[in-house]
Structures are given as C-alpha cells and as structure tokens.
Amino acid sequence: MNRSSLLSIATAMALSGAAAAAQAPDSYATDLGRVYGGYQRMLAMKEACDTAVPATRAANDKAFAAWQAQHRTLVQDLQRRVTAMILAASTDKDDYVRNIGQYEGAILLQRKEYRDTLLGLGQEELREQCRRMPEALTGPGADLAQVYSAELATIRKRK
C-alpha cells in the first residue's frame, strides 16, 4: 500500500458518495475513504449544529449518542483499517509517526472544511437541518452500513 492510496482516503472524504463513485475507481482505499468520510461528515454536522444552533444540542446529543452506539463496531473497524493502511505504507516507526500525523491531520482538515461549508449555509436552512437531526439520525440515510453497502463489501474482502 503506498502513500497515494492513503491520500485517497482524505480525498474521497471531501467528495460526496455519488461524486466519489463517479470520479474514482473502486478500490479498497477509495471505498474505505468513502465510508470513513461518511462518518466524518456526520461528526461535522454535529459540530456545526452545536456551534450554530446550540438550542438543538441536548436533543442532538442524545440522538447522536444513540447513532454512535449503533455504529460503534463499524467505526472501530474503519479506524483500525485506516491505521493499518498507514502502518503498511510506512517504512519504519519514525515514518509511521509522521504518516499518522499527516493523514489524521488531512482527515480532520476535510471534516473542518465540511463543517465550515455547513456553517456557511443560510441560518434558516442550517437551523432546520439541525432541528431535524434527531429524526435524520434514525433514518436510512444515516445508516452507514446501508448507505455504503457496496463499499463495505469491498472493504470486508480484506481482513
């Protein structure tokens, strides 16, 4: 696994699932990036709502905690796989330390950019999205296993 494959994780996170599917060939790294990016976008939405619409925080915290509990095993597996890819691309311990910082930083930057995009929406639009967040988190569009079933099939072919 090379560094460009790892970079595709951060790149794929910046793209919506449909855009990523249209622009990038299916591969383990790309699919991992899509699914992990979906998780990061959920975190960004929660952060944006907490910042811009604090009145929704209590309801969103409760709903988000339930959503995270539902996805805990999947998210832990994704995090393990991202870390394993970074380790495989590293030449030694020092290289791994540099790489982990670089790629985790890229992932956080993509999440921040998505959060900032959400914060740039009109106040009413964002307020409405934040108000509907508890309901949205229980819907099929928030079920990572359902939304990313094809990508997860590719990912799970590897141990």
Located regions from the model:
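Bacterial N-terminal signal peptides that target proteins for export
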Residues: 1-9
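Short, intrinsically disordered low-complexity segments enriched in Ser/Thr with adjacent Pro
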Residues: 2, 16-18
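Compact alpha-helical subdomains of small soluble proteins
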Residues: 64-159
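Immediate post-signal-peptide N-terminus of mature secreted/exported proteins
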Residues: 21-62
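Bacterial N-terminal signal peptides
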Residues: 8-16
